[in-house]
From Swiss-Prot:
Cofactor note: Binds 2 magnesium ions per subunit.
Protein's cellular compartments: Cytoplasm
Protein name in the entry: Xylose isomerase
Keyword terms of this UniProt record: Carbohydrate metabolism, Cytoplasm, Isomerase, Magnesium, Metal-binding, Xylose metabolism
Pfam families reported in the protein's UniProt record: AP_endonuc_2
GO BP terms: D-xylose metabolic process
Cofactor: Mg(2+)
E.C. no: 5.3.1.5
PANTHER family: PTHR48408, XYLOSE ISOMERASE
Length: 389
């Protein structure tokens, strides 16, 4: 079923266009530094904010009703509809890559065996869509932070059965990565850290975390599929302190445990700010050590101490880092747009920057953006960019 019949594919129309559903500055066919923009910038659409987000937050329930979630049937039926809607959005935007957590795409069922079966069925559908559209899997990951079993971590948990369950999720995730041709595999240790040092053996926990990563590497080698492993950095939230605090901390960990030749870093703007750094600092640290793997582009709120995934609002902040599109959440206060709430996914990506008056760049500013992109390319500072809506 199609959900966006009334929206044509988004094309580049230049800065003077009045069409809100058009790119004004991103021209995928324009050559910059010997390659097209599309070749230089591997934009990826993320499954979670784009398709599964319902507007719930820690203080309230869902505010959004997605058309693909309202048509009845089983949880698997809904999962298949989500795949169709997702690839339709990606095609409309011209995005060539995508990313997902395992629980984003398939229901977990009542057992690990049932979860595996659901993942197999849905990834068959994903593979069909990949072949049909040419869209590729940039990275996938296992959600090892939402279920209550992971409240004290996975690899750093004091319960062996929790460690084992998480390892089983990663095992399946690597098999799915091979099946779908994934280029990277991500670890975000949202609960790999501590609430208090009074009951924490930090050295032991980091030993266990390193062992977990080595097991993942060994298994990837055993199935002849060794993607680039990425650690997504975040200093806190939900834990008081997380072991992937920032680029320097993660690099020290990787070097200590002989993991640095297998891992690179996934840098997110908002997470850098939470660590007390600028995004530029984290990018430069990763680049200096040859560990810049992927970018989640967004911004936070300097006055808040938690992750907000907001749209960038200043031209200089966008151009300095080479941001083009951004890792952002739908607003809880945006339950609908016209009659289809699903249109928000497209409209936020294309129109929100217009509301913030970022697209009305002068010719000089346009040239500055291109010069900065060339500088970033020469410094090796452009890599995979994650676009989540």
């Amino acid at each position: 079923m199609a959900y966006f019949n009334d929206i044509a594919p988004i094309k580049y129309e230049g800065t003077k266009t009045k069409n809100m559903f058009a790119f004004r500055h991103y021209n995928p066919e324009e050559v910059v530094a010997g390659k097209t923009m599309e070749e230089q910038l591997h934009f990826a659409l993320a499954f979670w904010h784009t398709i599964t987000m319902d507007g719930a937050d820690p203080f309230g329930s869902a505010t959004m009703e997605r058309p693909w979630d309202l048509e009845g049937g089983s949880e698997l039926d809904r999962a298949h509809r989500r795949v169709d809607a997702f690839f339709e959005i990606a095609e409309k935007l011209g995005v060539k890559y995508y990313c997902f957590h395992d629980i984003d795409i398939a229901p977990t069922g009542n057992s690990l065996k049932e979860f595996y079966a659901n993942l197999d069925e849905i990834t068959d559908h994903l593979l069909e869509k990949q072949k049909e559209t040419g869209i590729k899997l940039l990275w996938n990951t296992a959600n090892m932070f939402s279920n209550p079993r992971y409240m004290n971590g996975v690899s750093t948990s004091n319960r062996a059965e929790v460690f084992a369950y998480g390892a089983a999720q990663v095992k399946k995730g690597l098999e799915l990565s091979k099946k779908l041709g994934g280029e990277n595999y991500v670890f975000w240790g949202g609960r790999e850290g501590y609430e208090s040092l009074l009951n924490t053996d930090m050295g032991l926990e980091m030993d266990h975390m390193a062992k977990f990563f080595h097991l993942a590497i060994d298994y990837a080698k055993s199935i002849n599929h060794l993607p680039i492993f990425l650690i997504e950095l975040k200093p806190k939230e939900p834990m008081t302190h997380q072991y992937d605090f920032d680029a320097a901390t993660a690099l020290a960990f990787l070097q200590k445990y002989d993991l640095d030749k297998y891992f690179k870093l996934n840098i997110e703007t908002n997470h850098a700010w939470l660590a007390g750094h600028t995004f530029e600092h984290e990018l430069n640290t990763a680049r200096t050590f040859g560990a810049l793997g992927s970018i989640d582009a967004n911004q936070g709120n300097y006055l808040l101490g938690w992750d907000t995934d907001e749209f960038p609002t200043l031209v200089i902040d966008i151009t300095l880092q080479g941001w083009i599109l951004m890792h952002v959440r739908l607003k809880v206060q945006q339950p609908s747009l016209k009659t289809n709430s699903c249109l928000i996914s497209l409209k936020n990506v294309i129109v929100h920057t217009r509301r913030q008056k970022l697209v009305n760049l002068s010719k000089m500013e346009q040239q500055l953006l291109k010069v900065l992109l060339l500088m970033l390319l020469s410094m090796g500072m452009t890599s995979n960019l994650i676009l989540t809506t």
